[in-house]
Amino acid sequence: MHILMTGATGLIGRELGKALVARGDTLTCLVRDTDAARRRMPFPATCIAWDHTRPVPAEAMREVDAVVNLAGEPVADTRWSESKKALILDSRVQGTRRLVEAVLEHGPRVGAFVHGSATGFHGDRGSERLDASSTKGTGFLADVVAAWEAQLQPLATRRPDVRVPVVRTGIVLARQGGALAEMLPMFQLSVAGRLGDGRQWMSWIHLDDIVGLFVHALDTAPFGILEGVAPRPVTNREFTAALCRSLGVIQNLPAPPLVIRALFGERAAIVLGSTRIEPAATRASGYSFRFDTLESALDDLLAPLRGGVRQRIWEQWLPHPAEAIWPFFGDANNLEEITPPNLNFRVLRTSTPVVGAGTRFDYTLRLNGVPFGWQTLIASWDPPRRFVDTQAKGPYALWHHAHDFVPFAGGTLMRDTVRYRLPAGWVGALAGGCKVDSEVTRIFDYRARKIDERFGGQSCP
């Protein structure tokens, strides 16, 4: 199947794209910046530059069988100024309208248009039990979602042959990205608690399930609403307790609503509002959830993060077999090429003439302007599929870096999984955790750019 996708660089889009390519689908992705998208999408795709205020290029619709619409300005990243609210609305309404127009004008083969919507449609409803048949709520987000979904109506009128399932997504739980990732640093330090009185309902879903639901919608679901939430919503009080149990930490004092509103402004409605949704339509459509309890979802996501460990994963698809890529990464001297210059990274010595399990590297670098000596131990070496390096001596209490080279879609999915913990326990994490997280992200973003320059990436005209 040839699928046109928007929002492919987002939390859901990256995982959905991998799932679709893995089963043999071909993707064309509409993106704002083709170079940035190439580095962020862990799957092969043809990328076409597009701005939601302009018509979709006709060539993007060529031989397209289905559309998946995940695009929209983030709602939870900054305070809602009037300009931000306008962008939240316009990116969704105009963008969806343009996509629908493209299907009507240039997409005769399109048989499905899967629309990613949001549970914000329901507004703040207290403990009322809601599902796909429930009425619209009140508030800014409810108005946005209603206007957003209304743009789909021309498809029902002029192309009744096109299936248009609408997935109203709730709070997506993922180890990296989304609401949970924002909560984790403070909870790991045991300085966070419930929000307000904790009675507000949270309709959540595991990332794997929301990806599975979009695939299900693409393949089988008819026109209509699907609730993108797990079968068992919880209150914020229950969520907080389960999160602390899974991490093995204690709860702290609750955050007063007045403080939350002062910090977040109108955006506080996202965390203080209550939405209790049951996925009746989703279950009736035949979808089977992998994670139907919060405990099972959190245990799956958080097991690697206990004991104050932080984890980041970077994935990059390269159009070469692992055998062609491995020699570059197996040579420690090439590390200088893919490390930011300001770190002054220098390899001093290698303990063995040929790299393998047990090899040690000594090098120097600067972190936040401070010089450090570092010794790395190659803990495992399995060419050309995997190697693991760990810090033997250095500034971290723990540093574990797994390099995986996975055959995928005619090339290689390169995955870097980094687990680290700062020294001095919670004091070190509180004092420098955010800065270190930012520095680690910057280092690996630079690494992705340099790897893309050397090995090439997507087909992005």
Predicted regions and their residues:
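N-terminal Rossmann NAD(P)H-binding glycine-rich loop of SDR-like oxidoreductase domains
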Residues: 3-23
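NAD(P)H-binding glycine-rich loop region in Rossmannoid oxidoreductase-like domains
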Residues: 35, 39, 45-94
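Conserved Rossmann-fold NAD(P)-dependent oxidoreductase catalytic core, especially the SDR/UDP-sugar
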Residues: 85-90, 96-139
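NAD(P)-dependent short-chain dehydrogenase/reductase
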Residues: 146, 153-158, 163-166, 170-201, ...
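Alpha-helical substrate-binding/gating segment
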Residues: 184-192, 200-234
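Hydrophobic ligand-binding cavity/cleft-lining segments
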Residues: 218, 277, 303-352, 356
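Mid/C-terminal beta-alpha module of Rossmann-like enzyme folds, strongest
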Residues: 219-266, 299-300
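Beta-strand/loop substructures that line and gate deep hydrophobic ligand-binding cavities in soluble
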Residues: 388-442
